[in-house]
Amino acid sequence: MYPEKPYHGVDSGALFRKGGYCSQVYPRATFAAMVYRYDVYVGQIIAKLKEKGIYDNTIVIFTSDNGPHREGGADPEFFNSNGIYKGIKRDLYEGGIRVPFIFSWPGLVEEGTVSDHVCTFWDMMPTFNEIVKGQSINTDGISILPTVLGNNIQKKHDYLYFEFHEQGGSQAIRKENWKLLHLNIQQEARYELYNIASDPAEIHNVIDLYPEKFDELRILMEKAHRYDANWPLLPSEFMK
């Protein structure tokens, strides 16, 4: 199954071909069938781990590298794939970068445990390295093993920085509950400021209400960006 290719699901008869998905074989019913098929495969993997007697000491992670997309005929609006969050894949709004993350380790992590710790994919390498007690490594990531094991002593990022070169170029930076976006950089650039704690759907741009916070995050964003000739982002970089 390749999420960015045309969807292929198992034909389960009336379960998907009638009723709930507008009776459309493609793409909606097919998408639903593919998700169902994926769920079945995960169940088969879990069953095999239990059969081998290694389930309790096996880590299973379920996540995504970005928000929902429209590739392959996907229809994220129909399935309300993002819930309240704005944006999809390639957007730096929460809908494009906030994803589900399930960390299953039955022998050490209590079922139903929930955490609001903010982490990112570059935290995975140091996390796995700490789990296997590997040699010290120098990365931008921070191990989330303390959070996984229920330890309150968890280091946090000072900020998280994102950028994307398509769609006119965009940047985003999150520091604590504040998030600044720099959008359409290469054409008609604009900034948007949100408090993610009180406005997770990013509806109310409060940039005019908090000029000092805007300046703080803008300066931090400029420092975080690194020029890369392969991925020019700012207008001045296309001249180099």
At which residue positions do the language-model features occur?
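Short, well-structured alpha-helical segments that form the helix of a local strand-helix-strand
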Residues: S143-P146, L217
